[in-house]
Each structure stands twice: as C-alpha cells, then as structure tokens.
From Swiss-Prot:
Function recorded in the entry: Intracellular thiol proteinase inhibitor.
Subcellular location: Cytoplasm
Keyword Cytoplasm: yes
Keyword Cytoplasm listed: yes
This protein's name: Cystatin-A3
UniProt record similarity statement: Belongs to the cystatin family.
GO MF annotation list: cysteine-type endopeptidase inhibitor activity
SUPFAM superfamilies attached to this UniProt entry: Cystatin/monellin (SSF54403)
Site features described as Reactive site, chain residue numbers: 3
SMART domains registered for this protein in UniProt: CY
CC per GO annotation: cytosol
Source organism (scientific name): Dictyostelium discoideum
GO biological process, one term: hyperosmotic response
Length: 94
C-alpha cells in the first residue's frame, strides 16, 4: 500500500549510503560540482510504485536533502535536491 512520507527520520544505514553513492555522480552533474564529502546522515521514505528516499547528506558545503526514487528491483535515480540545509532541518516531502 502506498502512503505518505515516514514521520520520523531514521539514521542512515549502509544500504542508504550505497543508494546515496549511486546517485552522487548524477547530483554532481546536475549541480556542476564535485564532492569529496558525501555522507548519508538520516532519511525518510515513502512507498510508491517503488520507493522514494528523502536523504539528508553531509557534503563539503554543509547539508543537502536529496530525493531518490528506486523502482522495485531497479536502479536508484536522483529526482531532486534541496541545497543549503542544516543538520537540524527536518526532512520534508519535496
């Protein structure tokens, strides 16, 4: 059953870091930058026809929120990004 975004952030797991690593190049290309720091901190998820992951990522410039869609048995793809976030900023749907 599909639904809303999970209410509380979850600490990033190795699986979430792997998803984050998979879309790093997509994000760098989109933003025209290269990151030496790209660490998943926490995330929320939303079950759709696949899974949306809303991930707080620590970067060289602070924190970004990225939205990644992963189809069932598919490859993760970057959907969107919110830049200039802080560690304290809540992860919300975007």
């Amino acid at each position: 059953m599909t639904g809303g975004i999970s209410p509380h952030p979850i600490n990033a797991t190795p699986e979430i870091q792997e998803i984050t690593n998979t879309v790093k190049e997509q994000l760098e290309k989109k933003l025209g930058t290269n990151y030496s720091i790209f660490q998943a901190i926490s995330y929320k998820k939303q079950l759709v026809n696949g899974m949306n992951y809303f991930i707080k990522v620590k970067t060289d410039n602070g924190y970004d929120h990225i939205r990644v869609y992963e189809a069932f048995k598919g490859t993760p793809n970057l959907v969107s990004v919110q830049q200039h976030k802080s560690l304290e900023d809540d992860i919300t749907y975007f």
